[in-house]
Regions:
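N-terminal nucleotide/polyanion-binding subdomain common to many enzyme families
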Residues: 1-81, 86-87
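A transmembrane-helix-recognition feature enriched in membrane-embedded lipid enzymes
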Residues: 69-70, 200-247
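Conserved beta-alpha
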Residues: 69-148, 152
C-alpha cells in the first residue's frame, strides 16, 4: 500500500486502512515497521535525506500531531485527523491477542510498564521486556538483537529509543527479523509505566488537542528547540505542499 506523501513523508490518515495494513502484516508474518510522525521527526526528515528514506521505507506511518493534521487538512481542503501513537499502543495491548516484545528505555520504566500492562492483559507477564545498551545507532549488534527477538517470535515489537534514533534502529534491524511489526513510539513506555517524570497530558488537554503544549512545559529543554526547528522549517514545507496540491 502506497500512501500519499504529505510534507514529503508517506502518511496514512485513514484509520481503517492504517489498522488494516498493520493487522494484515501481522497475520501474514510480514516484517515491517511503523513510524509515528510528528513535528520533530518530520523536521528531521525534511533536512536529512537518509532519514526521509527511513520514514518512507516504513510499512505505514501514522500522523501523531493534531496541529500537523490541521495544517495539512487546510492545505488539501479535507478533514484530516491525527492518530496518536499512545492510543494505538494501548489499543493493541487491550486486544489481548498478540504476542508482544518491549525493547528499549530503562529497566525501571520497563518494570513499571510490565506491571501496569499485565493488569490489562495477564499474558504480558510472560512476554519479553529488554533494555538496550546506550550507543550510537550504527553501533548496535543488530544480528544479536534480532536473534533474541526471533527466538521469542513476537507479532509486535515495541521500540522505545526516542526519535529519530528509534526509526533508524528499526530500519537497520528489519533485514535480520523473521517476522513481526515494529512500532517506534518513543515516550509511550514512560506514559504507561507510572514511574519517572514523563507523563501523558491530562484528559482535558487531550480533548483540546493541546498535548504538544503539555510536552513543551514538561520538558522545555528538549521540546521547545524541537518546536522552534519545526516552525522555522514550516514555511518552506507549506509553500512546497501548496504547489504540489495546485499541480
Amino acid at each position: 500500500m502506497k500512501e500519499k506523501r504529505y510534507f514529503n513523508v508517506r502518511l496514512e490518515f485513514d484509520k481503517r486502512k492504517l489498522e488494516q495494513t498493520i493487522e494484515n502484516a501481522i497475520k501474514e508474518g510480514t516484517v515491517g515497521y511503523v513510524c509515528s510522525v510528528e513535528s520533530n521527526n518530520l523536521t528531521v526528515a525534511n533536512n536529512n535525506s537518509e532519514f526521509l528514506n527511513v520514514l518512507n521505507g516504513a510499512l505505514v506511518n501514522n500522523c501523531d500531531g493534531s496541529v500537523l493534521a490541521k495544517i495539512l487538512g487546510y492545505i488539501h481542503h479535507e478533514p484530516l485527523e491525527s492518530h496518536i501513537g499512545a492510543d494505538i499502543f494501548i489499543k493493541y495491548v487491550r486486544m489481548c491477542q498478540y504476542r508482544q516484545f518491549f525493547l528499549g528505555n530503562t529497566q525501571e520504566v520497563l518494570s513499571g510498564l510490565k506491571d501496569n500492562l499485565s493488569k490489562i492483559d495477564p499474558e504480558i507477564k510472560n512476554m519479553r521486556f529488554e533494555t538496550l545498551p546506550f550507543r550510537k545507532v550504527d553501533e548496535f549488534d543488530y544480528q544479536g538483537i534480532a536473534q533474541m527477538i526471533n527466538e521469542d517470535g513476537p507479532d509486535i515489537i515495541w521500540v522505545s529509543l526516542g526519535a529519530p534514533k528509534q526509526e533508524m534502529f528499526m530500519n537497520r534491524l528489519q533485514p535480520y527479523l523473521h517476522r513481526g511489526v515494529m512500532f517506534g513510539f518513543g515516550a509511550i513506555f514512560n506514559f504507561n509505566a507510572g514511574v519517572g517524570n514523563v507523563r501523558r497530558a491530562p484528559n482535558w488537554m487531550l480533548k483540546l488537542k493541546l498535548e504538544w503544549l503539555h510536552r513543551a512545559f514538561e520538558d522545555p529543554k528538549k521540546n521547545v528547540p524541537r518546536y522552534w526547528n519545526f516552525i522555522k522549517t514550516l514555511p518552506r514545507l507549506i509553500k512546497e505542499e501548496m504547489k504540489r496540491d495546485d499541480g
